[in-house]
Amino acid sequence: IDSYCNDHYYHSIRIDDAYGSYLATNHVIGYGHKKIAFFCGQIKENGVIKKRLCGYQQALEEAGIPYDSTLVYEGKVDYDSGIELARKLCNENKDVTAVVATADILAIGAMKGFYEQGVSVPNDISIVGFDDLEISKYLTPGLTTVRQEISQKGEKAVELLLDNIQDADMTKREVIIPVSLSRRESVRYMRGEE
């Protein structure tokens, strides 16, 4: 589950991570943002974070926005890292108007970090997360985020396991669970301010 292992011995159940990040980035671009940071965990070749970075880059490219590697902030995928990355971004003063985060917990930490720096979400900076954790809709403002059906991944894994028990020689399958964007209040229109 959630692996990009290319071994033909294993089934694969995952989401299209690149497309999810593309959706998030395209959403903020659609709201008029051009200076968009990317908050993520450690980028590993063929990993989930790398796929999400590719989706971010693709959305920028399609919109004619040059990719700037200095706007990619790597940390850990946790709350404290989100706080730290927000502080770092504020201290570097890069005129960023939006952040695409690779996980809700990272985005939620970033919201706290921005708050501590006197930066208002979404008035001063917009943010989009990834996962659609239950808490994301209870925040103020509610976190716009990429929704992935985690329970559906589990159901598909059990289904594949049972099928494989009945037929040990079955062809290995790759199942891709669709993602969608949960629009809430953490992104604002720029109205030609950039």
Residue locations for each model-derived region?
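Short beta-strand elements in bilobed, periplasmic/extracellular small-molecule ligand-binding domains
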Residues: Q57-S81
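Short beta-strand/turn micro-motifs composed of small residues
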Residues: D2, R14, C40, E74, ...
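Flexible loop/hinge segments that line or gate small-molecule binding clefts
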Residues: I1-L23, I65, I105, D131-L143
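Flexible loop/turn connectors
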Residues: Y31, L85-E193
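Structural motif
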Residues: S21, E74-E92
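Short acidic capping loops at alpha-helix termini that bridge into adjacent secondary structure
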Residues: K34-K35, Y67-L71, V121-S126
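Structural signal for short hydrophobic segments within the conserved structured cores
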Residues: H11-I13, T70-Y73, T144, V175
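An alpha-beta-alpha
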Residues: A24-A63, R173-V187
